[in-house]
Amino acid sequence: MSYTPGIGGDSAQLAQRISSNIQKITQCSVEIQRTLNQLGTPQDSPELRQLLQQKQQYTNQLAKETDKYIKEFGSLPTTPSEQRQRKIQKDRLVAEFTTSLTNFQKAQRQAAEREKEFVARVRASSRVSGGFPEDSSKEKNLVSWESQTQPQVQVQDEEITEDDLRLIHERESSIRQLEADIMDINEIFKDLGMMIHEQGDMIDSIEANVESAEVHVQQANQQLSRAADYQRKSRKTLCIIIFILVVRIVIICLIVWGLKG
């Protein structure tokens, strides 16, 4: 199901799109972590690193898109009867999105560290290695050099080669892109933090209204209690007055009867 933001305002469709994106981000984070675990092993290759970079950029784009959708979801018009359910749904989406972003950013930081380590190894190998066989790529040999427990190198003073420079430039460019992507995720975290803060203010306002209502109810109960007490006292007073009147009437009747007798 496709969704065009800003058109239609279908909350159910938008919520489904947000949930789908969150699931994709979570799955991509798992795949990125799995790929990171292959770096520095015999499975490492330029193609693997390229795939890793593409997966990171795709996930970063998903995160930006999801952030925009959640903002739009919170601004959709709603009826008073739907407000509570809409808020619960938004809170759940924000919580799930925050969890998926946390895992993704953790993988991003690990990827950046791996790239920095790779650049350092390229620079180091250029200074200590006498060169690599012509039938193998520089990056393949670096992977092999990393995986060996006791690499054998021929120490020579040799200037850095063009291949080394190319690899370094590529990896440094990848590092800069990763750092920019990490900053993008930080901005999204700020947006989510603002949403949570606004929700907290709303909750505080609701709690204040509830407390105010409770105070009013207590005051009303006290007034009702006082009214009931007053009513009971009034009835008691009325009964006493009636009793006194009856007694007086009886006395007067007795006196009149006595005079007649």
Curated annotation (Swiss-Prot):
GO terms for biological process: intracellular protein transport; synaptic vesicle to endosome fusion. Residues 260-261 are vesicular. It is a single-pass type IV membrane protein. It is found in: Early endosome membrane. Its main location: membrane. Keywords: Acetylation, Coiled coil, Endosome, Iron, Membrane, Phosphoprotein, Transmembrane, Transmembrane helix. Belongs to the syntaxin family. This is Syntaxin-7. The lineage of its organism: Eukaryota, Metazoa, Chordata, Craniata, Vertebrata. The gene is Stx7.
